[in-house]
Amino acid sequence: MSEGKVDEFMAITGADDAAIATQFIEMADGNLNTAISLFFENGGAALLSSNNTPTPSNSTPMAPTSVDSDADAQLAERLQREAYQQQQPDQDYVRPPDEARHEVLTETSGFPISYGGIGGRFEPLHRVNDMFDEGRPESIFNQRLDDTNTNTYINDNSSDSLDSEEENDDDEYEYVEEPVIELDEDGNIKEYTKLVRKPKTISKEQKLALLFRPPFSIMSKLDLDAAKQKARAKQKWIMINIQDSGIFQCQALNRDLWSSRPVKTIIKENFVFLQYQYESRNAQPYLQFYHLNNKDDLPHIAILDPITGERVKQWNRVVPIPEQFISEINEFLASFSLDPKVPNPTVNEPLPKVDPTTLTEEQQMELAIKESLNNNSSKSNQEEVPSTGEEQKRVQEPDPFSTIEARVHPEPPNKPGITTRIQIRTGDGSRLVRRFNALEDTVRTIYEVIKTEMDGFADSRFTLNDHQREDLIDKLNMTIADAGLKNSSLLLEKLDPEIE
């Protein structure tokens, strides 16, 4: 143990016993700050005051201090005993109140460190990885920043230039020394090596990772509130992209749109760009405030006013073509301004759907009654208008069955591919099997044959259904082939006169 630590300990604490200083430093494993904290937390201040005051005559003399190799517990016990001995002469002794202290809480996002006291260490309140979905393992489709940056505070240091784009080139290319042989002006052979830029030999997995890499070079590593402050300071809009790594369209957005250099350029010049995963911590305030409650709306891109927080433009469920996206951005920048003196166009956003689970019981009842009344009124309006037209049609159009006449149709000879056999069964078990010309005979022909060849149906009303229980009265003018009745079995049912 260095004597410098002992001297520094005694100078800070005011202790005049080097043995005590040595003991506390050993207890703290050589950590001077921890040793000083232990000294004051375990009665060191009382020990100093007792050494500076005269000892009463009737008190027990203080035992000489000795250093014991394993005296941690003994030291604490001795300090406690000595404190009690100082209080014995005056039974009415009252400990003075703790000294008042005034301290200032430091803004945790201002410096990239963690903090903590003895026996504990606390992580920062906001981390860069709060942008990502930590509930899913890191993979090609769920990429994050390098491990060296994941536990730091949210502190955006991104520049407004695209110089950082070279990092992508570094991932794809490398410089290799190659020998070069040349002839100088005198005809002598000159041999040397030079660095040659060549594509790296990378695996298929690495190629996919580069292909679907998020746009880290333009992403601001901030939460939404900090991004608004930065955007106001730099007179820029906020562009936010909400993704879900399980939706391929979100991956296609990284691959096709955010990888475009012209898109990155226009974003860097005019926007503070944020990209959050749907389940991430940073995305939750946006999802709740702007009512993005359905993953079916992903990928979601929006432009926010950093002053008012208004969402002035958005894209949902699409992967814009880079050229079209740039055109829309230019139109937006031409129409909207961050100058408070310049009026902006009115934005009519669709009303968000109310989530019933977030309402109270009374609000849920009111919502249900309101929707029920709206549905009933809309249905009644829809039914009232066409009902008059339908009644007029029924008056004007004759009954299809009344147009069917009893006509004799001779059975055609068998012609493969042209004729077909159809079985007509009744409810009492009787049946009629007959050939028809599938290409020329219509469904009406079947009805006319029934009226002429089956007993009891000439003057009766009946229904004729196919094997799917579909009434064929609506297919009277269709050919047998078009109606799908080749080699079919039809069910014939006579209706009661009362039903007619």
Swiss-Prot record:
Q: Which GO terms describe its molecular function?
A: ubiquitin binding
Domain named UBX: which ranges?
415-493
The UniProt annotation puts the region (Disordered) at: 50-70, 142-169, 371-399
Q: Where in the cell is it found?
A: Nucleus; Cytoplasm
SMART domains, per the entry: UAS (SM00594), UBX (SM00166)
Q: Which CDD domains match?
A: UAS, UBA_Ubx5_like, UBX
Q: Which GO terms describe its biological process?
A: proteasome-mediated ubiquitin-dependent protein catabolic process
> Phosphoserine modification sites?
S139
Where does this protein have compositionally biased stretches of type Low complexity? 50-61, 148-161
Which key words are in the record? Cytoplasm, Nucleus, Phosphoprotein, Ubl conjugation pathway
What is a single cellular component term in the Gene Ontology annotation? cytoplasm
Misc note: Present with 6630 molecules/cell in log phase SD medium.
State the oligomer form and interacting partners. Interacts with CDC48.
Which PANTHER family does the record match to this protein?
A: FAS-ASSOCIATED PROTEIN, UBX DOMAIN-CONTAINING PROTEIN 7
Q: What does this protein do?
A: Involved in CDC48-dependent protein degradation through the ubiquitin/proteasome pathway.
Q: What is this protein called?
A: UBX domain-containing protein 5
